[in-house]
Amino acid sequence: MRVKRWLLAGIALCLLTGMRDPFKPPEDLCRISELSQWRYQGMVGRGERIIGVIKDGQKKWRRVQQNDVLENGWTILQLTPDVLTLGTGTNCEPPQWLWQRQGDTNEAMDSRTTVDADTRRTGGKAAKSDADGG
């Protein structure tokens, strides 16, 4: 009789606590794993109105302001030209996340010479020109 009670109590405890798949990672309610995919690109604004520009994990551009709450529950705590501080939630670890501004640089475009540009425009030959137009 005692074994049946313990077995019944064990089964009831399992049902009440909910079984989870041990091979599945725990659910990320705070979406902390997404933080590394987002980028703070910079800010624009004049006076008191400051708008931050961020890129999310799906490469979608978003405009945010201080104290905005994003759809995943994160809150924009501080917005400066170089840093965006984000609150992830009270029960989340870490409770705050800091992004430093990151701009995209295109090294190939920045290092291209004018001869390369002339070559594309003239159909493959770099045109020589001088002051008299010849």
Curated annotation (Swiss-Prot):
Check the record and name the InterPro entries matching this protein: HofP
User: Entry's Pfam families?
Assistant: HofP
Instruction: Please summarize what the entry says happens upon disruption of the gene.
Output: Mutants are unable to use DNA as a sole carbon and energy source and show decreased competitive fitness when cocultured with wild-type cells.
> Where is region (Disordered) located?
95-134
* Protein role: Required for the use of extracellular DNA as a nutrient.
Compositional bias, Basic and acidic residues, is annotated for 109-134
Q: What is this protein called?
A: DNA utilization protein HofP
Q: Superkingdom of the source? A: Bacteria
The GO annotation for biological process reads: carbon utilization; DNA catabolic process
